[in-house]
Amino acid sequence: MEDMRIATLTSGGDCPGLNAVIRGIVRTASNEFGSTVVGYQDGWEGLLGDRRVQLYDDEDIDRILLRGGTILGTGRLHPDKFKAGIDQIKANLEDAGIDALIPIGGEGTLKGAKWLSDNGIPVVGVPKTIDNDVNGTDFTFGFDTAVAVATDAVDRLHTTAESHNRVMIVEVMGRHVGWIALHAGMAGGAHYTVIPEVPFDIAEICKAMERRFQMGEKYGIIVVAEGALPREGTMELREGHIDQFGHKTFTGIGQQIADEIHVRLGHDVRTTVLGHIQRGGTPTAFDRVLATRYGVRAARACHEGSFDKVVALKGESIEMITFEEAVGTLKEVPFERWVTAQAMFG
């Protein structure tokens, strides 16, 4: 199909590489097919409120490759409000003459995209998350940048921990999966890594740290994913609360582990929570390339009429997978990967 009118939007948390996807969509649609691209602002809210801008293949689009965040803005929308607005969404897309929609987002966004597809809207999804937890794709863009940021923090904390004879805990993002923690811990030479997929025993962590000190190593680095949980009966956690989207908020698992280590071993323990710094800034070269390839493939899929699909990285190829494969389950860290990392502990 030629001369289409394609819409795109970014939803959920911001992520390095979003602008590269937008750029890939716009340049491919314009240069290869002579099509027009419209961007809805602030995610699903913008689609519901019909807040849109036309995206031109000009210098402004060319320059966004290096920028973090998203030029369209992003946000979250409660699923109930989203589903209640289906008639308005259809009307807005029809009034704007939209032939296809490319939502860019994580698991929640892709579930919303699937629901729109099930309701007759031509959709091609693009997976986005620094957590790397979308199933069916080898990597999501944003993950490499987040790992680079976390690894840099771990690298820097080695010297300060050693100078002060401290145990340093680095808490990274990862509510349900530990890909960032696993990779940053291994790349940064952490002495213990804690991930949600493997409930931890605080006694084992303490033994690993004490063993280091007994061997004459007067410091330790522990990388902890924010969603890590203790093995049942080994440590009592301070409770968080549930936010408006049904997500559990955390009271700082890194600090709770730090407090336990201090009480049990008496060592000076400090915690660094990286938080949203992992989402910001210029994307790495890997993420720019991957995000660009996602945008190009998504635009081509629209012109091929290949809807109700999600772009995905399989080996070296960008392929199309079903929404069911992408959102059916989270891509967790396999236990054997954690065992490999465990060999580097201590």
UniProtKB/Swiss-Prot annotation:
Name of a matching Pfam family: PFK
Record site: Important for substrate specificity: G108
Biological process annotations from GO: canonical glycolysis; fructose 1,6-bisphosphate metabolic process; fructose 6-phosphate metabolic process
CC cofactor: Mg(2+)
Enzyme Commission identifier(s): 2.7.1.11
Annotated binding of substrate, by residue: T129, I130, D131, R166, M173, G174, R175, E226, R270, H276, I277, Q278, R279
Family: Belongs to the phosphofructokinase type A (PFKA) family. Mixed-substrate PFK group III subfamily.
PANTHER family (alphabetical): ATP-DEPENDENT 6-PHOSPHOFRUCTOKINASE 3, PHOSPHOFRUCTOKINASE
Record's protein name: ATP-dependent 6-phosphofructokinase
Gene: pfkA
